[in-house]
Design a protein with these regions (language model features):
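Ribosome large-subunit tunnel/peptidyl-transferase-proximal elements
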Residues: 2-226, 230-250
Length: 250
């Protein structure tokens, strides 16, 4: 990617009030990673993430907030650059606790000239690498949903597979199947190595919230923080929403 072109996007670290960021960061306990007696422990901290860590306190690994701010701003910068170039961004979350958070974020950023979609709770293997086949399957489901969803709801029919598919793909629109996404924003990378591997095989960059035990291999733009903190995930999404709205007006 052209670094000179990226630098044209007007999003800088100066957009942040650093003191307020660090206050919000610690309030959300985003700096408190997993418990570990040894910062380099294979069980609790991944070697590739050690450079983002300060040390241990009360058996908790502490993530360096200065590193988080630097990497977070860089990630927002990249997201803004892709949006400005009219690229497609896919948000992936398979944590049910964050499902409503992702849905609310999506509804708040529905803009005609911005292509952002999401997969919630369940990832379909081969979604990126077997794109055409998976898209056909999802489009078949969508056609079924358009025709029978009202009937299923009105008659309170127990249809677990339909419910699971609906939950997973309600963040996708027909126009999202025109081509593969150009950038992935991954909420919980520890549970989704297969998503990263698919993206890497197709040279699709990945932005991800990375904890102390996250393997950074294949993650282009890590955001160090406690991935179990819903407040921190919400904070990240709020800033991404700002970038999306800014991009839509340029």
């Amino acid at each position: 990617m052209n670094s000179k072109a990226i630098s044209l996007y007007p999003f800088k670290i100066g957009d942040f009030n650093r003191d307020l960021f660090y206050k919000d960061y610690t309030k959300a306990k985003a700096h408190r990673a997993h418990k570990s007696l040894n910062i380099a422990s294979k069980k609790r901290s991944h070697p590739s993430s050690v450079s983002f860590l300060l040390g241990c306190k009360n058996k908790h690994v502490i993530i360096n907030p200065y590193q988080t701010l630097e990497k977070f701003v860089k990630s927002l910068h990249i997201i803004g650059f892709f949006l400005k170039k009219k690229k497609r961004i896919l948000i992936v979350n398979t944590n049910p606790e964050y499902a409503n958070l992702i849905e609310n974020f999506y509804r708040s950023t529905l803009l005609k000239n911005v292509s952002v979609c999401y997969c919630n709770e369940k990832w379909v293997g081969g979604f990126l690498t077997n794109w055409k086949q998976v898209c056909r399957s999802i489009q078949t489901f969508m056609a079924f949903s358009e025709r029978f969803s009202t009937f299923i709801l009105q008659n309170n029919i127990n249809f677990p597979r339909y419910k699971k598919m609906y939950t997973s793909f309600q963040g996708l629109k027909k126009e999202d199947f025109e081509k593969r996404p150009d950038l992935i924003f991954l909420i919980n990378p520890n549970e989704n190595r297969h998503v990263i591997e698919e993206a890497v095989s197709l040279n699709i960059p990945v932005v991800a919230i990375t904890d102390s035990n996250t393997n950074l291999l294949g993650i282009s733009y890590p955001i160090p923080g406690n991935s179990n903190s819903i407040e921190f995930v919400h904070y990240c999404l709020q800033w991404i929403a700002r970038v999306i709205k800014r991009s839509s007006t340029e």
